[in-house]
C-alpha cells in the first residue's frame, strides 16, 4: 500500500500535517477503487486547508500545482462529488497554488533583475483564484462597487446556465475568497440582456 503522503508534494520538502494527509489518503483511495484511476495517477496536490464559512459550515480548499490545474479541472466535477461524500457534505474547492511577487520599489529593484511577470501580480492572482473557485461555472461579468467609506464590494456575474450546479455553493465561494484575499465578493446570476 502507498504511504498517505504519496498524493501530496509540499514545497521546500515540508511535511504534510494531519488534515493534508487525510485529504491525500482520500485521493489515494479514489485512485485505487474508482474509474478516475488513469487521470488521478499523474496528479498531486501541494496543500489543503479547512476553513469556516458562513457560521457553522466548513469548506475544504485543496491547492494544486498550476501546470496540473487543467488536468484536475477535467475530472473536477466527479472528484468534488466523491470528496464531498467522503467528508460528509463539506464543500470542496480546487485552487491553483500561485505566487505573488512583491511590487518592485526603488529600494528593491536591484535584487530581482527580471521584470515581474503579469501572472505574478496581486491583481492577476486574485482574479485567477476567483476563476478557479467558481469552476465549472464561468465569470461573465464583474462590477466593483466602491462605497462612501471607500470599502469595495466585488459583484461577480456567473453564467446563468450553471446556476443549478453552483448556486448552493455561492456562500462558500464568497467565504473562501474573503479568507484567501481579504476581499468581499457577491455572486449573481443576471439575466443576459443586450
From Swiss-Prot:
A GO BP entry: chordate embryonic development
Organism: Danio rerio (Zebrafish)
Subcellular location: Cytoplasm, Cytoskeleton, Microtubule organizing center, Centrosome; Cytoplasm; Nucleus
UniProt protein name: Small ribosomal subunit protein eS7
Cellular component terms per the entry's GO annotation: centrosome; cytosolic small ribosomal subunit; nucleus; small-subunit processome
Subunit structure: Component of the small ribosomal subunit.
Name of the encoding gene: rps7
Lineage: Eukaryota, Metazoa, Chordata, Craniata, Vertebrata
UniProt entry tagged with the keyword Cytoplasm: yes
Disulfide bonds: none
